[in-house]
């Protein structure tokens, strides 16, 4: 069963994403911010297939979190979907430069999120096989 790590400081958003991912057949873990995410990933025996991450969070923002994940050889293959209220083209460019695989703005359609997550997992699997 594919595994997703939901990283957002808003409990209601984590709940919404968790619920829809579980209904779609995913195992779900949660982190409340970027620092919590990195702590979880470093301790995990089994890494998630995909991470959904917000941008604006306390302690460590989403862009810095993505950059840290991409810099770590053990984690750099994980697919990342940014889910945020920031939809300006400059925000999307910063996220893409940091290494996100997909970018969705809030409010988001839960079905589109599930579809996007499945898509980036497929692309991540192809990257992993070719490396």
Segments from the language model and where they lie:
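Short, conserved "switch-loop" micro-motifs in signal-transduction and mechanochemical regulators
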Residues: 86-87
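Short, glycine/charged-rich "phosphate-handling" switch motifs in NTP-dependent
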Residues: 101
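Acidic, metal-coordinating helix/loop segments flanking the phosphotransfer/catalytic sites
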Residues: 30-50
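Charged docking surfaces used in two-component/phosphorelay signaling
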Residues: 15-23
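C-terminal output helix
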Residues: 108-117
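Receiver (REC) domain active-site loop signature in two-component systems and cognate sites
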Residues: 57
């Amino acid at each position: 069963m594919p595994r997703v790590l939901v990283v957002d400081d808003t409990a209601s958003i984590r709940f919404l994403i968790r619920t829809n991912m579980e209904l779609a057949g995913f195992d779900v873990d949660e982190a409340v911010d970027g620092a919590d995410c990195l702590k979880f990933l470093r301790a995990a025996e089994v890494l998630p297939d995909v991470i959904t991450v917000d941008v604006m969070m306390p302690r460590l923002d989403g862009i810095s979190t993505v950059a840290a994940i991409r810099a770590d050889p053990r984690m750099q293959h994980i697919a990342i979907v940014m889910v945020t209220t920031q939809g300006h083209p400059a925000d999307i460019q910063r996220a893409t430069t940091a290494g996100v695989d997909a970018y969705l703005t809030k409010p988001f359609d839960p079905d589109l999120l599930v579809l996007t997550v499945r898509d980036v997992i497929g692309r991540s699997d192809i990257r992993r096989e070719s490396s």
